[in-house]
């Protein structure tokens, strides 16, 4: 049988030796834990807030999955939106593959809502590989922030056949255009978020979890 051990280290104690060797410090006004918060990927309120205590914890907070593979597998897929409007969405699909040997096969890309179906022969080599494919969605259903419209999603499904093996990977995403308009004026410079050509007020609240 196999035994899987998970070691959890202190976010503060792990960073402190690095802080001592650096000749500069990053700002951490609310940090009650020796100024380590800018160097860890944790919510700032973990390090103390105006009414919140300093509890810098570590733990497993999502499901754990043990993944096994033989000669190759799909590590991930990414969808980059090059251009998107109500008439057309130009996308680049990146497929990351890791392999123990050089392989050849075919890839099938399918998205049911847009009826995209793409099949093409591929080759990948030993080690990490990145494959890129250009896709077009005609008349896309645009994604909007809450209160401004619907949030339709597209499911991109990738299937690869190589040397008698089959691997599948899917990614769900919304299609939208997001830009930040920065125009100099008499007070400085604007910072307006536009989604699908519409200015959006980015509202929020300065609140940390009560529990």
Model-derived segments and their meaning:
Residues 1-211:
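Secreted/periplasmic carbohydrate-active enzymes, especially glycoside hydrolases
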């Amino acid at each position: 049988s196999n035994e899987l051990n998970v070691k959890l280290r202190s976010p503060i104690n792990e960073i402190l030796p690095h802080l001592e060797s650096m000749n500069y410090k990053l700002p951490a006004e609310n940090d009650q834990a020796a100024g380590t918060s800018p160097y860890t990927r944790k919510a700032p309120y973990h390090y103390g807030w105006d009414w919140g205590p300093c509890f810098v914890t570590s733990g497993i907070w999502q499901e754990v999955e043990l993944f096994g593979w033989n000669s190759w597998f799909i590590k991930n897929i990414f969808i980059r939106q090059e251009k998107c409007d109500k008439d057309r969405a130009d996308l680049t699909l990146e497929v990351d593959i890791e392999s123990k040997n050089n392989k050849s096969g075919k890839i099938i890309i399918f998205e049911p809502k847009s009826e995209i179906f793409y099949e093409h022969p591929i080759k990948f080599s030993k080690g990490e590989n990145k494959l890129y494919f250009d896709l077009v969605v005609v008349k896309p259903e645009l994604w909007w922030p809450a209160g401004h419209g619907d949030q339709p999603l597209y499911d991109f499904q990738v299937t690869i056949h190589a040397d008698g093996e089959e691997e599948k990977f899917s990614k769900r995403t919304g299609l939208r255009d997001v830009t930040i308009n920065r125009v100099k004026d008499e007070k400085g410079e604007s910072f307006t978020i536009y989604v699908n050509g519409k200015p959006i007020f980015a509202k929020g609240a300065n609140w940390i979890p009560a529990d």
